[in-house]
From Swiss-Prot:
Gene name as annotated: minE
GO biological process, one term: cell division
NCBIfam families documented for this protein: minE, PRK00296.1
UniProt name for this protein: Cell division topological specificity factor
Function field: Prevents the cell division inhibition by proteins MinC and MinD at internal division sites while permitting inhibition at polar sites. This ensures cell division at the proper site by restricting the formation of a division septum at the midpoint of the long axis of the cell.
The entry's keywords: Cell cycle, Cell division
Length: 78
């Protein structure tokens, strides 16, 4: 393997990682412009806590083109 080949593979991997990070930042910025998002998350959290003994609740937001999604992952306790 040539010296350039070794560095080319690393920069390709680095470029992919940078692209994924940029997608994450852009997604966060797009969903940050939704004024009711924080209130919605608080209300969902209150309802889940009312009906379950959840040990873990995680919110994540995604944005693809012009579609924003809010994902909620709830780990239920015994």
């Amino acid at each position: 393997m040539s010296l350039l080949g070794m560095f080319g593979h690393s920069s390709q991997k680095s470029a992919t990682l940078a692209r994924e990070r940029l997608k994450l930042v852009l997604s966060h910025e797009r969903t940050a412009n939704i004024p009711y998002l924080e209130d919605m998350q608080k209300e969902i959290l209150q309802v889940v806590q009312k009906y379950t003994r959840s040990s873990k609740i995680e919110f994540s937001t995604n944005s693809n083109q012009n579609i924003n999604t809010l994902e909620v992952e709830i780990t239920l306790g015994n």
